[in-house]
Amino acid sequence: ALTRLNEEGRGEDYSNIGVNVISLTDQDLQELYQFMGDLDALSIRYASRHPDQEGLRKRLEENIALTAVVEEKDTLTGQETSCWIKASDHFHLMFYDYADNSRLTEAADRLRGQLTIFSNAYEREDRPQREIFREHKKIWEAYRQKDYSAAASLMKEHLNRSLLYAKELSQKML
């Protein structure tokens, strides 16, 4: 675990002393979410060239149907929330699966660990869940209509809005 913190840039290793966990500043969050938005948008562009578009569209549609539970209930149970977060995260990962670019996926994986600390916390709240679902649905609609440029732009906007939740959470943690 300590080695992973180090690899993800969330820790500093001191020989014979241990690892010091680094806290993220607002500037760090800004850079992380902006870059992640760029990577996610790029994964959409790469995925749009994959020969099995029907397979990707089907998986995205199933994901949207699964996460739509936030529109149907006032509040999710703890177990439903955990399942929803996993499915919500998977929405992003499906584009990487179809991007067929291991270096893009590896770069995103390295950053994702740093963002997960925040997203797993704010995605437990009702308002962010609903807004994230609506944003995913818009991305899906653009992708389904083969407007890949719009889908990529919407993904970047989605990460920018997620940044606001992360900053709010960061302020609460101080």
Residue ranges and their predicted role:
Residues 18-21, 101, 129:
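Generic secondary-structure boundary/loop-capping signal
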